[in-house]
A protein has these predicted regions:
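Short, solvent-exposed positions on alpha-helices
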Residues: 88-89, 113
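Short alpha-helical segment immediately N-terminal to, or the first helix within
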Residues: 92-94
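N-terminal interaction/assembly modules
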Residues: 1-80, 124, 128-167
């Protein structure tokens, strides 16, 4: 398989994972808001705290809009798979229902490797569609930025670990 095809597959998997990442960010904002609210519970809240809570509420609404948009985008892409196919079912479980691979194995029922093979086949099937290929190519730059950020974060964590343990 050529490198370009592998990259398209990686980009498509990243696009399909947008719902999960958006939901995780929303969850993180909710946790921060709860922590701040708990710290100031029962205390007359200064204007600064109220403003911060209002800002967090606004961020949660924006993040929910991103989650909703990601769900629609994922559903639109998955629609290109054959209607009653196992590949479509696995993609829906993974990217719409956000099920773990263990949960998918049980729901289908198949082994993890069989589920993964079917999932990878679904990705290849999707990339046979011109519109899906176009979407993947349009998002490639954002995907590359995402990978670059992950790489930089990994290097930073490694550097901090080396400092901590005096290597």
């Amino acid at each position: 398989m050529e490198t370009e095809q592998i990259r398209d597959e990686d980009v498509l998997k990243w696009i399909l994972g947008q719902r999960f990442r958006a939901a995780q960010k929303k969850k993180a904002i909710e946790i921060r808001k709860k922590m701040i609210s708990a710290e100031h519970d029962g205390v007359d809240e200064p204007a600064g705290i109220k403003a911060m809570v209002e800002e967090m509420n606004a961020r949660m609404k924006r993040q929910q809009a991103r989650v909703d948009q990601a769900i629609l985008r994922v559903m639109d892409i998955i629609e290109y798979l054959p209607e009653d196919s196992l590949e479509k079912e696995i993609c829906e479980y993974r990217h719409i229902d956000m099920m773990s691979w263990r949960q998918i194995e049980i729901a289908v029922p198949m082994s993890r490797s069989q589920c993964n093979n079917r999932y990878n086949e679904a990705i290849r099937m999707l990339l046979q569609n011109a519109r899906v290929r176009e979407i993947a190519r349009e998002e490639r730059e954002k995907y590359e930025e995402y990978i670059q950020q992950k790489s930089e974060a990994k290097k930073w964590r490694k550097k901090m670990a080396e400092k901590k343990f005096g290597k």
